[in-house]
Amino acid sequence: MIETVLFDLDNTLLDFDRAEHEALRQTLLHLCGYAPEEMLRRYNAINRAQWKLLEQGKLTRHEVKLRRFALLFDEFDIRVSVKKAARQYEALLGIGHYYMEGAEEVLKTLAPCYGLYIVTNGTASVQQGRIGSAGLRQWVRDIFISEEIGFDKPNPAYFEACFARIPGLQRQKTVIV
């Protein structure tokens, strides 16, 4: 019988793609005065590639945050501060939350019966902001953010650190969604 459920945050509970798109669109509009869909799509590809490099240990989290904008701005010949863009984008992303369809109802239903936890990669300030603005803390017992844990998913060390912080965890009675 299942007792513990670990939910991934991005695109499981909250629609990260939508929040990312809106934060990027607002950042580009503010700093550049325009935000064409082509540029937004290209950012997504560049950003995913940078996070893959982080997971492979080839970049640091700080490098990812800046490099994704540096590459985008070089490609589109934009002369805007990469650091300023990264700061504004993260601030906007930190308040952007849109529930995935049915996620809120699932949490409300499961919370009284199971130990619910959030497991997520990402920047602590952004993820904490999104979790807080979405009101997710009311349903979960703890939140495990890779930047705070010191390892990124899917590294087994990340999950070992999470499991060690869950009182009385029985792995055979635990699922990850």
Provide a role label for each language-model segment.
Residues M1-E3, Y114-G115, Q172-K173:
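Short coil/turn segments at beta-strand junctions that form active-site/ligand-binding loops
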Residues I2-L9, L13-E101:
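N-terminal helical cap/lid subdomain that shapes the substrate entry/recognition surface
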Residues S81, Q138-D142, Q170-V175:
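Short acidic capping loops at alpha-helix termini that bridge into adjacent secondary structure
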Residues D152-V177:
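Conserved Lys-Pro-Asp/Glu-containing loop-to-beta segment of HAD-superfamily phosphomonoesterases
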Residues K84-R87, L92-G96, A103-A134, D142-E148, ...:
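Substrate-recognition element of Asp-dependent hydrolases with the DxDx(T/V) motif
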Residues E22, Q26, L71, E75, ...:
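Residue-level signal for well-ordered alpha-helical scaffold segments within enzymatic catalytic domains
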